[in-house]
């Protein structure tokens, strides 16, 4: 014990990122705000997985955002002992796999290191999401109106998640 106060536990919100400033505030920023509210004993920090987005924001706007490695190194340097990494990914695809691989290198650097799951992993996740989507889009449930939900797709096997979600939505309609 060197007399320093223990660093507050950190919840690292990891997303692909976006170079659109307004969109970032209402999407990624909203998720981070919800995390702060839900976990007030944690400091919420941000990391992006897209180095291209990070570089654009730095060059264009002077905004400095860590990639996952930089964020993890900073947590070690700051003396943080407890870390929860929560990706904002929808499916467990390549981006999520990369986050898990990178973060796992730091297992021995913290007293506690946990990695959260993407939005859609098991059957209950689909049920929960469909419940939210149904409630939040109820006002559009009128004759002649169609709702289209889009995912970016991937060559990863997790792409099947989108088909499963579609099947679940059709089954519950």
Where are these regions (language model features)?
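Short, structured motif recognition centered on aromatic/hydrophobic residues
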Residues: 11-15, 83-88, 146-150
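Hydrophobic, ordered structural segments
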Residues: 72-124, 130, 134, 155
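A short beta-strand-loop structural module common to alpha/beta enzyme folds
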Residues: 41-51
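N-terminal low-complexity, Pro/Thr/Ser-rich intrinsically disordered segments
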Residues: 1-10
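Short catalytic helix/loop segments, enriched in acidic residues and glycine
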Residues: 28-36
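Surface-exposed interaction/gating patches
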Residues: 136-166
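Conserved small/polar residues in nucleotide/adenosyl-binding loops
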Residues: 171-172
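Glycine-rich, highly charged phosphate/nucleotide-binding loops
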Residues: 61-74
């Amino acid at each position: 014990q060197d007399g320093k106060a223990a660093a507050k536990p950190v919840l690292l919100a990891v997303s692909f990122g976006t170079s659109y400033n307004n969109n970032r505030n209402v999407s990624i920023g909203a998720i981070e705000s919800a995390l702060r509210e839900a976990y007030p004993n944690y400091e919420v920090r941000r990391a992006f997985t897209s180095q291209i987005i990070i570089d654009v924001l730095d060059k264009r706007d002077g905004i400095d955002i860590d990639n996952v490695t930089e964020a993890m190194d900073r947590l070690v340097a700051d003396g943080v002992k407890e870390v929860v990494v929560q990706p904002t990914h929808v499916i467990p695809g390549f981006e999520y796999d990369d986050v898990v691989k990178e973060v796992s290198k730091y297992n021995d650097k913290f007293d506690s290191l946990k990695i959260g799951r993407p939005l859609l992993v098991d059957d209950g996740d689909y049920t929960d999401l469909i419940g939210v989507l149904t409630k939040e889009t109820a006002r559009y449930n009128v004759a002649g109106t169609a709702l289209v939900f889009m995912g970016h797709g991937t060559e990863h096997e997790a792409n099947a998640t989108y088909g499963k979600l579609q099947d679940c939505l059709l089954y519950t309609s």
